[in-house]
Regions:
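Hydrophobic transmembrane alpha-helices and their membrane-interface boundaries in multi-pass
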Residues: 15-93, 97-107, 123-130
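The cytoplasmic-loop to transmembrane-helix boundary for the fourth helix
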Residues: 111-133, 150
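Short, Lys/Arg-rich, polar N-terminal cytosolic tail immediately upstream
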Residues: 1-14
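Residue-level signature of transmembrane alpha-helical entry/exit and packing/kink sites
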Residues: 71-76, 118, 146, 150, ...
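Membrane-interface helix termini and inter-helical loops of multi-pass transporters
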Residues: 137-146
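Alpha-helical transmembrane segments of polytopic membrane proteins
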Residues: 45-52, 147-158
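Juxtamembrane or sensor-core-proximal signal-transducing alpha helices
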Residues: 156-167
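Alpha-helical membrane-associated segments of multi-pass integral membrane proteins
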Residues: 106, 114-118, 157
């Protein structure tokens, strides 16, 4: 247990480090994604990933300066926002839906949420995934990537998914 100076209660060390490591992993992910998208010849398309990288680094920095509950909310917002953005702009085939599972795990292992909140969050993630699925099935992505680009992004997303899930 760690006494987080901004919380009235103690924070389990594993939860604190899981959030901290997740931010670090996502920062590396966004950096690699910027390199990939720029390498594909679309440097302007990398700007949103650069924005998410900055937000992720700020959230990582402020993990020691804000309530752990707020950090959990930041993590969920960063992740859910990225999933929605990425699927909308690059399509279903890129594997971004995999990042829903770490969100579900963080919620389930959070000591700060009631059972009702955990169930409500699970329903929210389910609805979000289904809405994104139906959208991607009925609309083409904004940026159409080539087959090899989709493969590279799919591999990157799969590797990062397994790494972030393992923390």
């Amino acid at each position: 247990m760690i006494n987080h100076k901004f919380d009235a209660e103690t924070t389990p060390l594993y939860f604190y480090f899981a959030l901290k490591r997740s931010y670090e992993i996502y920062a590396v992910y966004f950096l690699l994604l910027i390199i990939c998208i720029t390498g594909f010849g679309y440097p302007l398309h990398a700007l949103p990933a650069a924005g998410w990288l900055i937000v992720c680094l700020l959230a990582r920095y402020y993990i020691n300066h804000t309530f752990i509950r707020w950090n959990l909310l930041f993590y969920v917002t960063i992740s859910a926002g990225w999933i929605c953005y990425f699927l909308y702009y690059y399509g279903w085939e890129t594997g971004a839906t995999s990042f829903i599972l770490p969100l579900l795990l963080v919620s389930m292992f959070s000591l700060y949420d009631t059972l009702f909140n955990k169930i409500a969050f699970t329903v929210f993630l389910f609805i979000m995934r289904m809405a994104l699925f139906f959208h991607c099935q009925t609309h083409p992505p904004v940026y159409v990537l080539t087959g090899i680009h989709i493969l590279i992004i799919q591999i990157l997303n799969t590797v990062v998914f397994f790494v972030v899930t393992s923390v």
